[in-house]
UniProtKB/Swiss-Prot annotation:
Keyword Metal-binding: yes
Descriptive protein name: Adenylosuccinate synthetase
Protein's organism: Cyanothece sp. (strain PCC 7425 / ATCC 29141)
Cellular localization per UniProt: Cytoplasm
An example molecular function term from Gene Ontology annotations: adenylosuccinate synthase activity
Subunit composition and interactions: Homodimer.
Active site: D13 (proton acceptor), H41 (proton donor)
InterPro entries reported for this sequence: Adenylosuccin_syn_GTP-bd, Adenylosuccin_syn_Lys_AS, Adenylosuccinate_synth_dom1, Adenylosuccinate_synth_dom2, Adenylosuccinate_synth_dom3, Adenylosuccinate_synthetase, P-loop_NTPase
Any Pfam family the entry gives: Adenylsucc_synt
Pathway(s) the chain acts in: Purine metabolism; AMP biosynthesis via de novo pathway; AMP from IMP: step 1/2
Length: 445
């Protein structure tokens, strides 16, 4: 038995969907523990591309129980669209469960999200505009509407009338926008309630029962460590806790129930939206990474900013999450490069900094690089470490050494089979993967 958390070790978009999909084969239960439709993961199976925002990747395995936990915020309209999309592809959703205590995103949340971002002007934070922040704000203010409220028509009507009237004041007075008609929203969401009702349960009991029965549980995080509300690059963060500790709160399990934490990181770095990005490449090389990596957001379609691998934020993710191992994705994107740089430290006001700094200092960081040779040949066909070009293997060893954590999985493309499993990241021995000892890495002057 193993209870495993999968988290993003960068700014999100690391390829967690594919890794979770691979690991779901060994899982009895997959739990999404935070975030909402601001996250998106793409899974490719037999040439079919699935873009999901709320439903866990494990839905592709009919014997795997998939849970949307209480720490998430759910947009019912989007969730139903995903259910319909899966049905068209012949994927059963009978194994999907929705926590009755998860909060619900309303139309006014989306409108307020976009209006507030517009009002920030030059201080905008790069929100997706999907209403996530305002939904979590209502949760914190204890005025939010939960799934269990959605399931009771009388309660929903009472709460929505009050909520809509309250939000209309904000929309009209602060943002100069027209008010909502409570009756229209009530009618719309009562329809959603009937569609989702068969999936709604007390998920904390389901998860507790799975733990008691020693079933394999996979906790799936959205976004990434550097977008964490408390530990990320504030204020350019999300409104929840994607870090491993968030799994306990968002799923309703004790910390002693977690056996292993797996971090997912690209072989380079990307970021969407605003905020400092020390290793960002704004030249043709950045465009090359964007084109080869198809770096456009699953949720917003926005172009991602691209840069070299940043081991400083990587080590920070290892520390904050207690990572046991790493999955490195999109190694194949680097196949055409003559040389590859890795940020090993920062220079801040003339001083070397090897630890992740506070937000004010982070905005002044200049990267300090180590340069490694590229391999200039395709890797997407490789299925073992022995198949990799020596320079590619050296690059992975260097990342593992500088991050001080072993690499368990290497992804070389979007398809399931384009993967090297170094060792079973769920059942394999902890910290016994690549590399076992420091590895000398040739460098280009």
């Amino acid at each position: 038995m193993a209870n495993v958390v999968v988290i993003g070790a960068q700014w999100g978009d690391e390829g967690k969907g594919k890794i979770t999909d691979l690991l779901s084969k060994s899982a009895d239960v997959v739990v999404r523990y935070q975030g909402g439709v601001n996250a998106g993961h793409t899974v490719v199976v037999n040439g079919q591309t699935l873009k999901l925002h709320l439903i866990p990747s494990g839905i592709l395995y009919p014997d795997t129980e998939c849970i949307i936990g209480s720490g998430t915020v759910i947009d019912p309209e989007v969730l139903i669209q995903e259910l319909d999309q899966l049905k068209l592809l012949g994927v059963s959703t009978a194994n999907l469960l929705i926590s009755e205590t998860a909060h619900v995103t309303m139309p006014y949340h989306r409108l307020i999200d976009r209006a507030a971002e517009e009002l920030r002007g030059s201080h905008r934070i790069g929100t997706t505009g999907r209403g996530i922040g305002p939904t979590y704000a209502d949760k914190s203010e204890r005025t939010g509407i939960r799934i269990l409220d959605l399931m009771d028509a009388t309660t929903l009507q009472e709460q929505l009338r009050w909520a809509v009237n309250h939000k209309n004041v904000l929309l009209e007075k602060m943002y100069g926008l027209p008010p909502y008609d409570p009756a229209e929203i009530i009618a719309e969401y009562l329809t959603y309630a009937e569609r989702l009702r068969p999936h709604v349960v007390d998920c904390s009991l389901k998860i507790s029962d799975a733990v008691r029965r020693r079933r394999n549980i996979l906790f799936e995080g959205a976004q990434g460590t550097l977008l964490d509300l408390d530990h990320g690059t504030y204020p350019y963060v999300t409104s929840s806790n994607p870090v491993a500790g968030g799994a306990c709160v968002g799923a309703g399990v004790g910390p002693t129930m977690i056996d292993r934490v797996i971090g997912v990181a690209k072989a380079y770095t990307t970021r969407v939206g605003e905020g400092p990005f020390p290793t960002e490449l704004t030249d043709q090389l950045g465009e090359l990474l964007c084109d080869r990596g198809a770096e456009f957001g699953t949720t917003t379609g926005r172009k991602r900013r691209c840069g070299w691998f940043d081991a400083v934020i990587g080590r920070y993710a290892v520390r904050i999450n207690g990572l046991d191992c790493l999955a490195i994705t999109k190694l194949d994107v680097l196949d055409q490069l003559d040389e590859i740089k890795v940020c090993v430290a920062y220079e801040i006001d003339g001083e070397r900094c090897e630890d992740f700094p506070n937000a004010r200092r982070f905005a002044r960081c200049q990267p300090i690089y180590e340069t490694l040779p590229g391999w200039k040949q395709p890797t997407d066909h490789c299925r073992s470490l022995e198949d990799l070009p020596p320079q590619a293997l050296n690059y992975l060893k260097f990342l593992a050494e500088i991050m001080e954590v072993p690499i368990a999985i290497v992804s070389l493309g979007a398809e399931r089979h384009q993967t090297i499993i170094v060792e079973d990241p769920i059942h394999g021995p902890k910290r016994a993967l690549l590399p076992a000892s420091p590895v000398p890495v040739p460098k280009i002057a």
